[in-house]
């Protein structure tokens, strides 16, 4: 029959045909996805529920003028299964994957809240940083040359060649926000700030280097789009979802993207409400370092993991990359395609424009920052300097 797009009616038919519900079951189906690339349906018969996710052959956020390969659904399914191999507690269960229809049937996580929405609403997730730090350390270590035999790593790397979605990252994170491109989207009040950004040759040279790292450093399997909208949370649970951008890339990429999105939420808050965001930024890194170090010592398979001075160099390189990638993400989410609700839903226009100018300023400082001795306090320091007016956009 070939590929066809599901509807709420045909999603139920599909689920029944594949044994997820009895033929006579009264199944309620709703499309619940608010993402940019896929259909997501929730199906519930009153006793059990599932999620059906289908990749579209184009970017939903733009339309059929932006075609995309549906093979990304297979990438996502395989990534979730790789993640589950190392940290099953932090990902949804994958029940099945249909490559022809680009359909994945997965665990329903509606008991949890999308972390971005929860943070905007002021909810607190005390275990978020611990869980994400552990998730990142395990996945990045075990899919790298340090935790995986080189032959196995090369084979796995070939499984995650993801040209369509990597091209989106190349363009929307590293290229378009730094010049005159049609994909950019911003308020006229930001134009002067943006003109200064685009004319900053030192900044562009640094962005070029981070883009090159993304293109060439195949260090570990990365989620590729790890923001607070790609995480479900509750006070006791954390689940990472939507790894359709998964590919082999730099260790620091996912870390930087996550930190940037926590910073964006911090910019949307009053000063006295920001502490929890910096707690999560700093604890994510400390849990990552702690777990990665334990794995390096106990599970390292590469010969030079026995050299005591090698690990500190690796960790410093990861941190340096995370700083720059965070800066790129801050700018992209402010003036590029696919904004974040943290800033866009600030109701007072003057406050919203000010927060966006601060996001651009902070992003620029993170990209241009150069120090081999910086630690995780850097984010708090530069943030405070930015919002207090010590750094101008």
From Swiss-Prot:
Source domain of life: Bacteria
Coiled-coil features, chain-numbered ranges: none
Leading EC class: transferase
Catalytic activity, EC: 2.7.1.100
Subunit structure: Homodimer.
Gene name in the database record: mtnK
Key words of the record: Amino-acid biosynthesis, ATP-binding, Kinase, Methionine biosynthesis, Nucleotide-binding, Transferase
Name of the protein in question: Methylthioribose kinase
Reactions catalysed, as given in the entry: 5-(methylsulfanyl)-D-ribose + ATP = 5-(methylsulfanyl)-alpha-D-ribose 1-phosphate + ADP + H(+)
This protein's record includes keyword Kinase: yes
Binding-site residues for ATP, renumbered to this chain: 38, 53, 107-109, 242-244
Binding site for substrate: 225, 332
The protein's annotated pathway: Amino-acid biosynthesis; L-methionine biosynthesis via salvage pathway; S-methyl-5-thio-alpha-D-ribose 1-phosphate from S-methyl-5'-thioadenosine (hydrolase route): step 2/2
Task performed by this protein: Catalyzes the phosphorylation of methylthioribose into methylthioribose-1-phosphate.
